Amino acid sequence: AINNLKNIDVHLIARKSKKIHDNRTTAISESNLKFLKDNISNLNTKIFWPSKSIQLYYETKNEKINFLNIKEKNKSLMHVYKNEKFKKILLKELKIKKIKVIHKEIKNLNKIKNYDLVILCLGSDSKIYDKITNFRSINKDYKEIAVTGHVKHKLKKINTSQFFLKEGPLAIL
């Protein structure tokens, strides 16, 4: 990936981030972890929590149904990590690879028209996204909210589970 970009100028244009603590986590497969190990020179694999068990539950009016229960003795099914810790590793890797980070907000396409290749990672609320897609996206308001919480515990073994309750999904990672 980044290792193969010799003799190419790469600019990462990003809005100056606000120092907000991010408790979110992400789960990746064994093959994705291998890709990261192969392509990130300063990857600290201690930030990844291997999981050998995945359980999915669905709640009906009268019962909770465990509709998926996968256990593996010899290999990890997925690896969970804190997004904030992984972001720090990626930013350090950008410095090592001499990728120029430009902190500014792009409000129109004229600012980026001189690049040979532009890859945009934008939310659906972006005005640039609207211009590129020509307002062809479909939006639906489900009139629902999501609540994310962080529970600090001292458990040594985490069994990853997801429950589909009548109130909505609950993931324990």
Residue ranges of model-derived segments:
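Conserved N-terminal helical subregion
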Residues: 34, 49-132, 138-147
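Glycine-rich, phosphate-binding/catalytic loops in enzymes
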Residues: 5, 27-29, 134-139
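Glycine-rich FAD pyrophosphate-binding loop
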Residues: 2-24
